[in-house]
């Protein structure tokens, strides 16, 4: 899978010898080999790092079969922003490179330069629709209008086979997470490569005209991006925990049978995706947000069956509860919610079949976030979901 941008794959290449990755003078050889998938896969297998190529998931799957130790990273981008970027890319191709383009790409470049943006989108819908879903679903860009539901199902299933999922909009944090996980030196630069000249950029008016059609063309990509966001947030939360553990002498302790670990938002927080602590008429709490996913790491090593009780002081919108998901150790678990005085109490039972050796990971996810300004016109624009007061974990027994 293309790793999402020149800056990012240059960062990856900095961690390998020059001949361990694809050299710029090797592209003609690789393009010839593409006609023979087996020979192409074998040639790529000789490399330590594969970047620059636009590969769909079928190529990735072949590499994974040849080398189970292969690690795959991809960056997803907000679909409409990606389309804006691609149109600007085609507009900026230098004249000196025109002779090297095939007929399809030459037409794209000439049309991007000469046609109104909305006419260009209308003509080249196939190239601008659900590209990331096609890549992850193993479907060529040349396939016109693949059925959306099977495409999205395949893309999301294959996304689970990607080791590291990052976001173009969070490229520096993605690089930090990957450096920590892979033992790389983080050489990610703030320098922007392949910058589009102002006269080749889409104007604000052009973007407004084509935003709606592009959103409609990329409904699968929008859903795929949302799934990718959750993978990225999980990776970022674990990276922050790793940084904390490396710098701290604190070690989680076993949770004996029948004992209860009680965590209050009065205590120091180890987690990600939470607003600052707030004091209220009842007790301190933290709002989950601003993203749709919030993670809390608890300092215990439970095993077997657990009972979890979460005290929720407030919910920004009733719509949050209809989509709220709870995961324990990255496994979705069912839960019940009941009213207790001024609070909502969420209760769940989770089974951890393997003895845990580290922190207990609790994740709260929702379909959307809201602000007090959105809901009631209050001058508070922070995106929030639920306000958590306490979390209790009881060790019930071993599996």
Segments from the language model and where they lie:
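PAPS-dependent sulfotransferase catalytic core
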Residues: 34, 52-58, 187-250
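Generic structural signal for small/hydrophobic residues in well-ordered secondary structure
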Residues: 4, 78, 166, 178, ...
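PAPS-dependent sulfotransferase catalytic domain
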Residues: 22, 28-75, 81-190
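Glycan-recognition and processing domains
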Residues: 246-303, 316-317, 367-399
